[in-house]
């Protein structure tokens, strides 16, 4: 990617590159900063070696993410780059980062990325900048420039920012601030713009998508948003970060009634046992887990279910973990992500007693992965012999088509690998939907033959 200025403003001296760590919310922030700098005449380049300024957009959710962020910061400062640190680590450690790494030229908080051009201008003048709001309040709308890589054919669409929950293990409310939703009109406007750019799939994201609109409309309004988005000419609309409390009859009906909202439910349940959920400060969830999963399966038989889990939470006993394994076996999720509890300073769980040893936590993670691999393999093998609609995203070095069915979300799930008879114009397949016959499956991916472009 090399992004040239889209306007007639005089080119600035700095050539800027971005290094991104973390989730898709962070990625959207990066894309907005790229768009804002481009608007102001800066040359934004994906080749960090060619840049003299690197903006490292960091993650501070867990320790491993912080370590990766620090590695990148040090890598670029050691190369003599002028480094600006953005994102969650800047928000989290706004008073410590520049003291510990004095080579850093500037900090930008999670609610301040719209100021990137002004921050860079000050850095160019030799100033050390700390632009971090105490409480993040900003959320970009469709009017804020954004660079979207159209070669990926998929774009994330942020519908809200921040979180009003206080889960015991999670530091996100401190890093991202309180929930603030965009209007339905703003979101639909951006979706239409993405459709005009050739985007084939949009993925709705926020900290809790099912709480969308509570702050501005006085009640959760995801169902109304989905009904409006279903009118936008984008083939696939996917939703991430849905919570059981928000999967109302109206929301489920919107999934059923809309042709372009794919029946893919990303439900970060974290655990199944009531005792553990209570310790996580999610006591409301235990009674809902069973009923909402059964309801989704009953109402939408083609539904794909994904969840994320935490093992090794303080106080998690053997019987709690066995309850979790039984829960997985009973509900047979299509996809599961599992993480070991990471104690975070500033969260309620940091000081909880009855810590689970790292060895036990690691073994439990491996156990969950093993159980889920068997389930996922059975799920995937059930598609063998069927025809599926596949979005082709790239061409492999072996001249195979690499894509996804609606069953797979990008980055976190598997892929579909397809052979094709006519290899002359393979590039014509990129960004297109094809019909494919599935002939083989393993626990992660599907394999088959391309039948035709749809």
From Swiss-Prot:
One of its GO terms (biological process) is tRNA modification. Keywords: 4Fe-4S, Cytoplasm, Iron, Iron-sulfur, Metal-binding, S-adenosyl-L-methionine, Transferase. Residues 14-125 form the MTTase N-terminal domain. Residues 149-378 form the Radical SAM core domain. GO terms for molecular function: 4 iron, 4 sulfur cluster binding; aspartic acid methylthiotransferase activity; metal ion binding; protein methylthiotransferase activity. Binds 2 [4Fe-4S] clusters. One cluster is coordinated with 3 cysteines and an exchangeable S-adenosyl-L-methionine. Belongs to the methylthiotransferase family. RimO subfamily. This is Ribosomal protein uS12 methylthiotransferase RimO.
């Amino acid at each position: 990617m090399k992004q040239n200025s889209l306007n007639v403003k005089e080119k600035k001296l700095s050539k800027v590159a971005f290094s991104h760590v973390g989730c898709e919310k962070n990625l959207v922030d990066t894309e907005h900063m790229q768009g804002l700098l481009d608007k102001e005449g800066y040359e934004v380049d994906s080749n960090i070696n060619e840049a003299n300024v690197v903006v490292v957009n960091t993650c501070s959710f867990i320790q491993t993410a912080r370590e990766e962020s620090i590695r990148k910061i040090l890598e670029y400062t050691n190369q003599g780059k002028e480094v600006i640190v953005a994102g969650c680590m800047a928000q989290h450690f706004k008073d410590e980062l520049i003291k510990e790494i004095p080579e850093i030229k500037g900090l930008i908080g999670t609610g301040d990325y719209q100021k990137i051009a002004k921050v860079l201008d000050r850095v160019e003048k030799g100033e050390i900048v700390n632009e971090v709001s105490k409480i993040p309040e900003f959320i970009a709308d469709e009017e804020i420039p954004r660079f979207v890589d159209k070669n990926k054919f998929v774009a994330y669409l942020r519908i809200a920012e921040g979180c009003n929950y206080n889960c015991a293990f999670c530091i996100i409310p401190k890093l991202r601030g309180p929930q603030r939703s965009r209007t339905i009109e703003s979101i639909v406007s951006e979706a239409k713009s993405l459709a005009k750019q050739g985007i084939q799939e949009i993925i709705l994201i926020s900290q809790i998508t099912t709480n969308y609109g509570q702050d501005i409309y006085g009640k959760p309004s995801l169902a109304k948003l989905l009904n409006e988005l279903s009118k936008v000419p984008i083939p696939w609309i996917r939703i991430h970060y849905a919570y059981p409390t928000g999967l109302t009859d109206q929301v489920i009906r919107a999934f059923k009634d809309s042709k372009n909202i794919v029946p893919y439910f990303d439900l970060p349940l974290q655990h199944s046992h009531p005792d553990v959920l209570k310790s996580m400060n999610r006591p409301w969830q235990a009674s809902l887990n069973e009923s909402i999963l059964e309801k989704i399966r009953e109402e939408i038989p083609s539904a794909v279910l994904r969840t994320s889990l935490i093992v090794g939470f303080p106080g998690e006993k053997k019987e709690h973990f066995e309850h979790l394994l039984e829960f997985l076996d009973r509900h047979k999720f299509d996809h599961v992500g599992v993480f070991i509890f990471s104690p975070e300073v500033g969260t309620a769980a940091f000081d909880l007693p009855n810590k689970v040893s790292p060895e036990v936590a690691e073994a439990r993670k491996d156990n969950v992965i093993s159980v889920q691999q068997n389930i996922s393999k059975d799920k995937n093998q059930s598609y063998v012999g069927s025809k599926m609609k596949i979005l082709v995203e790239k061409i492999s070095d072996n001249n195979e088509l690499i894509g996804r069915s609606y069953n797979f979300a990008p980055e976190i799930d598997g892929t579909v690998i397809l052979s094709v008879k006519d290899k002359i114009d393979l590039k014509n397949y990129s960004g297109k939907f094809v019909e494919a016959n599935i002939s083989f499956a393993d626990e992660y991916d599907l394999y088959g033959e391309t039948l035709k472009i749809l």
